């Protein structure tokens, strides 16, 4: 796969004991070792965290707009992350992840990945993106991300 457009760091660690995260070093797990699509989607997801760091003004504008669209966003596992702020970030990230997956693996496989993740973690966030992707997409595009 040509993932160059979604690479924002080349410093990557693979650690089978860690939950994937983007900072301080982008770290991926081996949980989905037998599913290339899930591995690829996780890679794009974590790289997108780094992309938001590179565009703080656009990122802040998108979060402000999402707060208006989703004033009562779920907080806490498994529906979301540990804060509303991080959930707004994740709506952006998951939208970009879904669009990247569509380009890299096609709509059917991308949808299957999102469906799986909507039953795994950040459940509400992934379900919301599947339900109405363009609602978040309009915000992402309008903010310049």
Model-derived features with residue positions:
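Short, hydrophobic/amphipathic alpha-helical patches that form generic packing surfaces
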Residues: 87-102
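Post-HEXXH active-site segment of zinc metalloproteases
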Residues: 36-41, 53-90
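Short active-site segment of divalent metal-dependent hydrolases/proteases
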Residues: 44, 48-52
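Short pre-active-site segment immediately N-terminal to the catalytic Zn-binding motif
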Residues: 26-44
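Pan-zinc metallopeptidase signature
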Residues: 102, 106-145
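Auxiliary, metal-adjacent structural segments of Zn-dependent hydrolase domains
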Residues: 1-23, 87
């Amino acid at each position: 796969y040509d993932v160059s457009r979604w690479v924002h760091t080349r410093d990557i660690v693979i650690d089978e004991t860690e939950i994937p995260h983007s900072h301080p070093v982008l770290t991926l797990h081996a949980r989905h070792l037998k599913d290339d699509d899930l591995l690829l989607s996780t890679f794009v997801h974590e790289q997108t965290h780094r992309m938001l760091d590179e565009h703080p003004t656009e990122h802040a504008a998108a979060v402000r707009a999402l707060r208006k669209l989703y004033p009562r966003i779920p907080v806490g596992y498994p529906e979301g992350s540990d804060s509303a702020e991080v959930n707004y970030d994740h709506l952006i990230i998951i939208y970009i992840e879904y669009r990247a997956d569509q380009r890299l693996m096609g709509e059917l496989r991308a949808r299957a990945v999102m469906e799986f993740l909507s039953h795994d973690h950040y459940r509400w966030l992934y379900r919301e993106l599947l339900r109405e992707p363009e609602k978040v997409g309009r915000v992402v595009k309008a903010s310049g991300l």
